[in-house]
Design a protein with these regions (language model features):
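A late C-terminal transmembrane helix in Major Facilitator Superfamily
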Residues: 132-165
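A membrane-interface helix-boundary motif in multi-pass transporters
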Residues: 158-179
């Protein structure tokens, strides 16, 4: 049972981080470059992973002192709010290049919080499985392997969402529900 919850929280953090790392430049290209040719996806592609990685390092030390559960919970709530804002703010169905700045801020904030959550969840696993370090190591390996599918799953499901509904909002609502369940 604990393995399932650990997997869900790690998918919420690292899975979203890895998925957005792959999908972020493509989203810019597909959503905003047609509205303004001067928006270059490659100019922004590395900022998200950089911010997420930096927040993981910085908040890893905080998670080591606090145990990680509170930071994971804060991350879940922040991701629910931010992803909902991406959908409800119209940033996934833009009508103006002026919306790009809001899109960029929200996505970079998502990267920031996934970095925090990534550090916090990895701190929790050895605590949750303190009776068996071997089990803790297995859970860390399992959750990392499952969450590593993030880039593949993100792009496949965004494509499917666009095929079904014409845009990616369906996938992102699914992501919100996943974050609610993991939080």
């Amino acid at each position: 049972r604990h393995t399932l919850y650990c997997t869900m929280t790690y998918i919420m953090t690292f899975g979203i981080f890895a998925g957005f790392s792959a999908a972020f430049p493509l989203m810019i290209k597909n959503l905003y470059t047609p509205l303004d040719k001067s928006i270059d996806p490659l100019q922004f592609a590395f900022y998200g992973p950089l911010i997420g990685s930096a927040s993981r390092v910085i908040f890893g030390k905080i998670a080591d002192k606090t145990g990680g559960a509170i930071l994971t919970h804060i991350t879940g709530i922040a991701l629910i709010i931010l992803i909902s804002g991406l959908i409800l703010g119209g940033y996934l169905t833009p009508t103006s290049p002026d919306q790009f700045q809001g899109f960029l801020v929200i996505v970079l904030a998502i990267f920031f919080f996934t970095g925090i959550g990534n550090a916090a969840t990895f701190k929790q696993f050895p605590v949750i499985f303190s009776e068996s370090p071997r089990k803790a190591a297995g859970v860390i390996g399992w959750t990392a392997a499952v969450a590593a599918f993030g880039p593949f799953v993100f792009n496949v499901l965004i494509t499917q969402s666009r095929a079904i509904s014409g845009d990616a909002r369906l996938f992102f609502w699914f992501l919100v529900v996943g974050c609610v369940c993991a939080t």
